[in-house]
Amino acid sequence: MIQLAVLAVVGTYYVRRQLNQPSPLLPLDLLGIPIFRLSILTSICSFTAQMLAMVSLPFFLQNSLGYSEVMTGLLLTPWPIATLVTAPAAGYLVERIHPGILGSIGMALFCIGLYSLSTLTADSSVTGIILRLMLCGAGFGLFQTPNNSTIISSAPTRRSGGASGMLGMARLLGQTFGTTLVAL
């Protein structure tokens, strides 16, 4: 409890000090830009959801479905492969389709994929698992690329370094939240 109190005091001091710096280490002033703030929050949420799935799935696949460690690893592979394929495609499309539309399509696919993962049962086939994971990965790739582009482009050009730092912080914060939620 004492540690949390110290964290609150030091955190408050740090944030107030950063707000008065010309080149802050933590550029909180960028959160005053509505589209930047929304994109950062959706990035945090998407990485939280991703880690919830990616950390909990190995336990489910091994303990509930009885797959070996090797098979579990192979079953999880379609997600990053689908992301690997769709993220560059989204980079190409973001120049032709509004990032909000493309990101919304990606987020919708990601949510459908996550929901479909929640319907897995002991009778689910390997093909069914792979298709669900591919849907998650494809949606994630279609969402992240336009969202990242929006984050960087919504900040003033001279602040692109700070925006990039906030992008990395959002990713790590989301991954940390997701992993922590699995542990609870």
Located regions from the model:
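Phenylalanine-glycine-rich, low-complexity intrinsically disordered regions
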Residues: 1-2, 15-20
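12-transmembrane solute porter fold
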Residues: 3-6, 10, 22-184
